[in-house]
């Protein structure tokens, strides 16, 4: 029988399978415990085995005790469950895998509640929905931490999502803390221009707030970053990377949009507000910032990353698939430069054939990309 449950980064999907002598398959449910009773005709099994020459000389290494029950008035056909498992879509499997991985990680590590930052963006919206589905709305806490950079649109989307989910939320503005840190560091920074340093102060302030809530109440902090960001280093160490579990760590940004669409389809309503799908992705750490100011379009970025990470394509092989060479070189440079961040990130749930973590053992110091 196959195990169904989560263990750290791994999720075991169940689907125990019985194959009848005639090739008919009976498959148990996926991502949950199941119980099947199957009646196998041993005489029929022997006949099928004898038809295959390769099995005639098979020497059974394990002794099996057969118990044959004679049931009065038994029908001549074997008992089969009325309905066996039907294979689902990739998005459905991803949703159930992430829910199971999160639920078991929380339960098996002694947590009861989780907390996450709600920015009004797609990643935090999806994490919030998955957490509610896995743990129940009463066990999920959302924190909105606006600054002067945060748009009214983002605030509205975060509030609407929280109301749709029915989760308890806290609003903790970070503007005064941000100003205080800038004032504290100004004499040290002297006349150096404003840059990503000050932008990252905002992310790190939010990380401090979330970890403070975790320490005080014993809540597990959920990281909301994705595989596209972790691959390219488009995340702030000790900021939005702070937390105990990154459930989207192995999903590319393009996958996240598909999974989110599927969740709304399943619900029959816009649990994740439509505006979250329509607006341009942004970290909102400076005025007018958009992800594509620093990264290629996600459709291009994810295509390059998938070929390199999952398929082990070389730079030249990726270019041969139609990608611009300079873009590929840029993406692979980002990937290599960000190794030190990935080494310090929270564990995430593995849903691909090669995830960052146990599957990805690359050095920080030495070059590995030509």
Feature locations, PLM:
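ATP/NTP-dependent adenylation/nucleotidyl-transfer catalytic domains that generate, transfer
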Residues: 4-6, 44-119, 124-370
């Amino acid at each position: 029988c196959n195990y169904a449950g989560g263990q750290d980064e791994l999720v075991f999907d169940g689907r125990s399978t019985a194959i009848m002598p005639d090739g008919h398959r009976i498959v148990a449910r996926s991502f949950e415990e199941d119980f099947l009773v199957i009646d196998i005709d041993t005489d029929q099994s022997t006949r099928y085995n004898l038809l295959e020459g390769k099995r005639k000389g098979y020497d059974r290494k394990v002794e099996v005790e057969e118990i044959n029950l004679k049931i009065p008035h038994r029908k001549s056909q074997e008992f089969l469950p009325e309905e066996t498992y039907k294979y689902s879509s990739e998005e459905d499997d991803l949703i159930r895998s992430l829910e199971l991985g999160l639920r078991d990680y929380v339960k098996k590590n002694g947590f009861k509640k989780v907390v996450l930052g709600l920015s009004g963006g797609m990643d935090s919206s999806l994490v919030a929905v998955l957490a509610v589905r896995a743990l129940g709305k009463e066990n999920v806490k959302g924190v909105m931490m606006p600054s002067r950079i945060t748009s009214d649109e983002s605030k509205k989307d975060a509030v609407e999502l929280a109301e749709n989910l029915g989760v308890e939320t806290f609003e903790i503005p970070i503007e005064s803390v941000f100003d205080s840190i800038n004032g504290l560091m100004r004499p040290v920074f002297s006349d150096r221009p404003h840059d990503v340093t000050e932008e990252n102060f905002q992310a790190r302030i939010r990380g401090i707030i979330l970890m403070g809530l975790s320490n005080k109440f014993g809540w597990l902090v959920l990281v909301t970053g994705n595989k596209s960001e972790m691959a390219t280093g488009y995340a702030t160490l000790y900021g939005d990377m702070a937390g105990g579990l990154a459930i989207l760590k192995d999903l590319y940004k393009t996958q996240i949009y598909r999974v989110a669409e599927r969740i709304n389809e399943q619900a029959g309503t816009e649990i994740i507000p439509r505006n979250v799908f329509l607006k341009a992705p942004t970290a909102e750490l400076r005025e007018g910032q958009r992800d594509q100011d620093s990264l290629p379009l996600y459709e291009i970025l994810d295509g390059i990353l998938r070929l390199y990470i999952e398929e082990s394509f070389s730079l030249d092989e990726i270019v041969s698939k139609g990608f611009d060479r300079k873009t590929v070189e840029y993406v692979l440079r980002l990937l290599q430069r960000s190794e030190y961040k990935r080494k310090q990130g929270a564990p995430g749930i593995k849903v691909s054939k090669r995830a960052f973590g146990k599957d990805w053992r690359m050095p920080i110091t030495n070059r590995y990309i030509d």
